[in-house]
Amino acid sequence: MADESGDAAGCPPPAPAPIRRQSSANYRAYATEPHAKKKSKISASRKLQLKTLMLQIAKQELEREAEERRGEKGRALSTRCQPLELAGLGFAELQDLCRQLHARVDKVDEERYDVEAKVTKNITEIADLTQKIFDLRGKFKRPTLRRVRISADAMMQALLGTRAKESLDLRAHLKQVKKEDTEKENREVGDWRKNIDALSGMEGRKKKFEG
């Protein structure tokens, strides 16, 4: 009994188990355990019904806009193209009326041509301004480049034009040496061994002293 009490008194008590937070335990349980996905509040049949209703409304709006355009076109034609009164007109009067109608048609064609020219000009200006904006922003579309085989002479000709031949003539800036001058120098130098023999010995020293 004494030994057991001594061993119990000498050994330290066991450390308590770490206490885990309730929030972390709940998070682990939620992450590990499978859970059902949240169901949508609207069923599939209800979604299909709403889509069908939206398509029907859009179709009705398009039909109404087309009917309004047809009505506007009819009103414009009725105001501009009045009905002809041909009752009681003679042959000469009918000819005059035809001439007036042809003149009016020609005038309308001229106006239509002018309007088309203005529209084309405006479209071109808009395209140019849009391209300038893209160039300033640095977002221009690069064209596709094709690989072309070209020689160095043709490339220099394309870049420099008439100056290509002048720039390629590299010997034009070099110093030209005449053949007669080189032969004269060779004659003056002569054989170098004879010069060494002439300057060696007492005679050579005498020549150096006298020179």
Swiss-Prot record:
Pfam families: Troponin (PF00992), Troponin-I_N (PF11636). The record marks 81, 98 as: Involved in TNI-TNT interactions. The modification N-acetylalanine is found at residue 2. The modification Phosphoserine is found at residues 5, 23-24, 43, 45, 78, 151, 167, 200. Phosphorylated at Ser-23 and Ser-24 by PRKD1; phosphorylation reduces myofilament calcium sensitivity. Phosphorylated preferentially at Thr-32. Phosphorylation by STK4/MST1 alters its binding affinity to TNNC1 (cardiac Tn-C) and TNNT2 (cardiac Tn-T). Phosphorylated at Ser-43 and Ser-45 by PRKCE; phosphorylation increases myocardium contractile dysfunction. One of its GO terms (molecular function) is actin binding. GO terms for cellular component: troponin complex. Keywords: Acetylation, Actin-binding, Muscle protein, Phosphoprotein. Residues 1-23 are annotated as: Disordered. The modification Phosphothreonine is found at residues 32, 52, 79, 130, 144, 182. Residues 33-80 are annotated as: Involved in binding TNC. Belongs to the troponin I family. PANTHER family: TROPONIN I (PTHR13738), TROPONIN I, CARDIAC MUSCLE (PTHR13738:SF2). This is Troponin I, cardiac muscle. It comes from Canis lupus familiaris (Dog). The gene is TNNI3.
